[in-house]
Amino acid sequence: KGKFVVGVTNARTGKSEYLDGLTDDRKFTASRATCAMPLLFPSIRINGEKYYDGGVADPIPAQHALSDGCGRLILVLTQPKGYRKRLGKQTKAAARLLSVKYPALSKALLERHLVYNRQVLFCEELEKQGRALILRPESPLDSFEKDIETLRQTYRMGHALCESRMDEIKAFIAQA
C-alpha cells in the first residue's frame, strides 16, 4: 500500500511537517496549504495552527522520503542542472513583513535558498549512488507563470522529457 504525504510549513515554528494526505486530509486542507505561499496567499488553518507551502522549510523533501522508508527516489525538479537559488529582494521584503508576527517563518524564508542549494547537491549525490533518478527541464521554469499557453507548453515539455527517458525510468524502477 502506498502513501500520500503532504509537506507543509508551520507558520509559528517555521519548520516542515508531513501529514498523511489519505487519512488526515479528507477536505484537502493540507493540500491547499502546499500551495499557500506566504504573503501571496492566506495561511491555511489545520488543528488550530497556520500553515504554508511545505517548500518554504523543505524545498526538496528527499531526506524526509528516505527517512520515511523510501529506498530510491524519482525526483522531479523545476530548474535545470547547475541552477542555484539566490536570496532575492522579494524574499527579503516578504521576510521583513512576516518577521513581527512569524519570526521563525521569516527566518525559514531567508534561509530557503541555502537549504534548496544543499538539497540539490544531496539529490545529485543520491543520483551518483544510484539511489535517485532526477528529472529536470533544460531551461528554467517560472514558478509564478500565469500565461495559460506558456503553462501548456511547459506541461508538454515535461511530458516529452518523461517520454524521452521512459526506458531509463522503467529500468530504475525495475531495480527496486
Predicted regions and their residues:
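Patatin-like phospholipase
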Residues: K1-A176
